[in-house]
């Protein structure tokens, strides 16, 4: 039995083959008197492969009635193509129709808006744009693990359901088995003792606190998995569900953290440019004509390092009119970050030493007692892409920060224990 081969493999062939088996979906079908041309895609790459079907193929009359979206199994000969555009084509000897698609198939051969594709999310991976997105995402996911495994980081699976609010913002999705039509009460409040876990539980906003415990046991560790934020914000910077990468480096400070962040971003961009050239070219043509220049900028430049205080001063003196006021003690907005990366420095920037009042409790308090050893990596066209910090390793200081933030100390006893027993600097 002939083994199925993918289009990405066939198009990269070094020589013709007398018999290949291809399976995929019709993108276009052009019929003529004695033969027809079918463009087939199987999702393995952006490119289609052309199949030539002669009229003497057994079920030719059925084949020419097919429309975009139908699925086929094609057996035939891989030949050099005399036409322009691609090196190889297939001359079919037999075709099995696997599945038909009515003429109202929602993805006809034309460009579709993201808004329209969102209404058919179950079919949009078959579109060129979203097929490319998910192939790139797959390659990036592999590269993320490759990067950390090559540097002897341990991959940790942290809990999805948690009783801790890592970020302290309270924007969490609750998890409960209580009957919402008849919620049990105790002293006027919800009685979580009757809930599944016997206390309030939520979907995690971060695996960081958990992965820190492994960092302080196994050395370098990382987590890479789903994260949930109940932020009522309809911007490109906020999502209810996303996958987050959270490395922790033992015996490290903020300088080590910034260095790892730059190395990580440049590694991923390099890997993607090398492995996903065809898909990136699609985005460079139809989505962002400056894409490749932006990626080359990230790869080829050291990241500028700038303290938050200096960044605020630079922005205030820039003469640029911003929608949001720039003042010390306020977080930088996307417009501020993009000004720094796209107009002033014109390359990636790392802003560090942020005011403690706008950052999380676990970040190390600096000697000025006004700022913490936190950093954000900003890149052109996006703004913030990484946030990180040196963690507060001093037991007394961390305990006081928990108190100052009005957190329940009892919820963080285990986290404090990691500083109580053999604490070390980490980031």
Regions found by a protein language model. Give the residues of each.
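A translation/RNA-centric and nucleic-acid-associated enzymatic feature enriched
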Residues: 161, 171-267, 281-427
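Residue-level recognition of alpha-helix termini/interfacial anchor residues
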Residues: 59, 276-280
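Generic non-transmembrane alpha-helical segments
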Residues: 143-151, 264-275
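Class II aminoacyl-tRNA synthetase-like tRNA-binding/catalytic domains
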Residues: 2-250, 422-423
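Acidic/polar loop patches that form or flank catalytic/metal-binding clefts of enzymes
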Residues: 156, 273-277, 322-326
